[in-house]
């Protein structure tokens, strides 16, 4: 089990939840500190910049584990730096395969700069590999997901891809969505971009992608398997694990 946290973005936090987005990094840091206090069984008396908790709350049962790894999803330079300082693992976002190795290396350097051992932090893959016979359908679903995040989930995802050199593709997707809606935006996503982020294919293709991610520094892989029965799924997972 891991605990996954992230700041989300201003559009979701302010328009959906109805609360101010900033200071998002301070809020996230305090979440991490509070969760660790609770799991350690300490009385919850916390004096942060945003949260002040005085009642000394404790869990009414002993946790099975006193420490659950906290992974943080982050993509802006400030949030990635904070992740290196406080998290047990990093969930990178919107990093195509060809950019993965330098981005992971840069993160591990931030961990060193924070005085921590980079080998003790786990980096999860930024995109899933899906073993499926319905490759075209899976690719279209990934295109729809990517187009929606680029156009409707705030600036961070769009800016991340622009930073990595995909400004033209991002502009085309946004223009198509504005003019033709979801279907047009989805159709504008280049095959090469979506496949570098979310691979769907045969077991062999997915094994190759997992190996490429591992070579780029990924420790934990996100895998989906579409199989007819549990025995087939186990065999596929065994091949992916190698």
Question: Can you say where each PLM-predicted feature lies in the sequence?
Answer:
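Active-site-adjacent structural elements that line small-molecule/cofactor binding pockets in enzymes
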Residues: 1-242
